[in-house]
Amino acid sequence: MPAKNHRRAFGLKILNASHHGVRQLKRDGAVAEIHGNKFWNSSYLIMDYLKKTPLPKRSRVLEIGCGWGLLGLYCAKQFGNRAHGIDADKNVLPYLDLHADINEVRMTREGKTFNQLTTDYLRDFDVILGADICFWDEMTRQLF
């Protein structure tokens, strides 16, 4: 029986490190520098909440500290939201693209830090989501 290289949750296919696409990205040099080396389960909590309390259709969603982007992809796939992800580590963005392709969902993304978020930038979004984004104490100061 072949090794399982992905799992399914909340209507999404989530790749494991053993998936050939993930391994190829690593070989190509997309090595995470700030804890974006995998999908973090904390996004499940928000997905579970959103499943019970859905976002309005076509909401403009910003996922901050998106990593592999599964939270934004969930919103795009389940609610038809327009999702955009930002992460300080540009090396994780190819993993978001891979998951978007595998899940047949469109999500835009860019490398950006919390300090680069301005009021004008945030006005373009209806909802801001982030899961497990303050893993260092000094990161909370940047958000508040």
For each of these PLM feature ranges, what is it?
Residues M1-F144:
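S-adenosylmethionine-dependent methyltransferases
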